[in-house]
Regions:
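Active-site beta->alpha N-cap acidic-glycine motif
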Residues: 1-88, 92, 96-99, 103, ...
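Catalytic domains of cell-wall/extracellular-matrix polysaccharide-remodeling enzymes
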Residues: 59-60, 83-203
Length: 203
């Protein structure tokens, strides 16, 4: 689906207000063997983030689910089995989301957020999610950390960050960790502040 459709559809959040001087860093696909290193890096940089967790992985690591929240980050769902949402019928799609909420063990607050694995949405799956009360989280800037192992490439992709951007990263990759200090330094030099997605879109 095109970004213009997301921007016009109630219940979808892709880019925050450009007047806010804030951006949201988001990380998909955790928890995994590198989660604590990501959390330590964000602690050092003193920035909060939003983590979209795979329910099946979260169910096996409730300690890490709690740790994200303890360190001040927002957590949200990313499907239970990382299946493409646009390939699922209504029942299976909502079951994926409900099972993930259960795996997150009461660490959610307010209306639940969800990000479709691979950004895989069509009109039907989008309607199902919004009608069920989910806030659908997309992104406005893709770091493309899945297509390189060079931190310099990520820094280059993120050089155009501006107010309101929601930036897509992934857990489990050393090059993403290596690039983060430079990316955060650049956004601070531009007068931007890192916040969670919840705070970026708070009214």
């Amino acid at each position: 689906m095109k970004n213009a459709v997301y921007d016009a559809f109630p219940g979808v959040r892709r880019r925050g207000p450009i007047t806010s001087k804030r951006v949201a860093l988001t990380f998909d696909d955790g928890p995994d063997h590198m989660t604590e290193r990501y959390l330590d890096a964000l602690d050092e940089l003193r920035v909060p983030a939003t983590f979209f967790l795979v329910g099946g992985r979260a169910a096996s690591r409730p300690d890490l689910v709690r740790e994200y929240r303890r360190r001040g980050h927002q957590i949200a769902g990313h499907g239970y089995d990382h299946k493409r949402f646009n390939k699922l019928g209504r029942r299976e799609l909502l079951e994926q989301c409900a099972r993930t909420e259960t795996a997150l063990g009461g660490q959610l607050s307010g209306r639940p957020w969800v990000r479709p694995p691979h950004g895989s949405l069509d009109a039907s799956s989008l309607v199902y999610l919004v009608a069920a009360g989910y806030t659908v989280a997309m992104w406005s800037l893709d770091s493309r950390d899945y297509g390189t192992t060079n931190p310099d490439d990520l820094v280059h992709e993120c050089a155009g960050m501006s107010a309101g951007d929601v930036v897509l990263f992934h857990e489990g990759q050393q090059w993403t960790l290596d690039a983060l200090p430079r990316i955060v330094a650049a956004l601070h030099a531009s007068g931007l502040e890192c916040v969670t997605m919840h705070d970026l879109f708070a009214r």
